[in-house]
């Protein structure tokens, strides 16, 4: 991988702000795709779910999901903001330091939850689709690449921490 540029960092930062501008909506988009909205209960039924359709075992990793993705659930938005923020922070680290160091708690948490390589890939796909929706016509191959590199690096750092933790 070449050096992560200031422009790539700026692309990630600006699109992260677009994501945060409508955090409740984009949090639901992150977990759902082609969902059915039940206006009586305000819930999103898990049909064609971005993450859970592709990796059903991941449902147990998100205790706040329950039986439906509730857009009013603050834990849903909080988790999405935290995850997207980690990727944004990864972009900053890549640009300033040339490498990403994961928070020490992320390895053990992901190990405890049993996160697999497939689930990392599914989250990456959902993240990219969500950012694409958040930025609309500002989406570009360059923007996609910046998010992909930043995600891949934080995922690699978490996987490394998971591997180190399993040796202890």
Curated annotation (Swiss-Prot):
Pfam families xrefs: Globin
Keyword Transmembrane helix among record annotations: no
Annotated GO MF terms: heme binding; metal ion binding; oxygen binding; oxygen carrier activity
Keyword Heme in annotation: yes
Chief location category: cytoplasm
Post-translational modification: Nitrated in effective nodules and particularly in hypoxic conditions; this mechanism may play a protective role in the symbiosis by buffering toxic peroxynitrite NO(2)(-). Nitration level decrease during nodule senescence.
Biological processes per GO annotation: response to flooding; response to water deprivation
One GO cellular component term: cytosol
Cellular compartment(s): Cytoplasm, Cytosol; Nucleus
Tissues expressing this chain: Expressed in root nodules and flowers.
Nitrated tyrosine: modified positions: 151
Binding-site list for O2: 79
Binding site for heme b: 63, 82, 110, 113
Induction: Down-regulated in roots upon waterlogging and in response to drought in cv. Embrapa 45, but not in cv. BR-4.
Residues recorded with modification Phosphoserine: 63
Quaternary organization: Monomer.
Function summary: Leghemoglobin that reversibly binds oxygen O(2) through a pentacoordinated heme iron. In root nodules, facilitates the diffusion of oxygen to the bacteroids while preventing the bacterial nitrogenase from being inactivated by buffering dioxygen, nitric oxide and carbon monoxide, and promoting the formation of reactive oxygen species (ROS, e.g. H(2)O(2)). This role is essential for symbiotic nitrogen fixation (SNF). Maybe involved in water stress tolerance.
UniProt name for this protein: Leghemoglobin 5
Gene symbol of the encoding locus: LB5
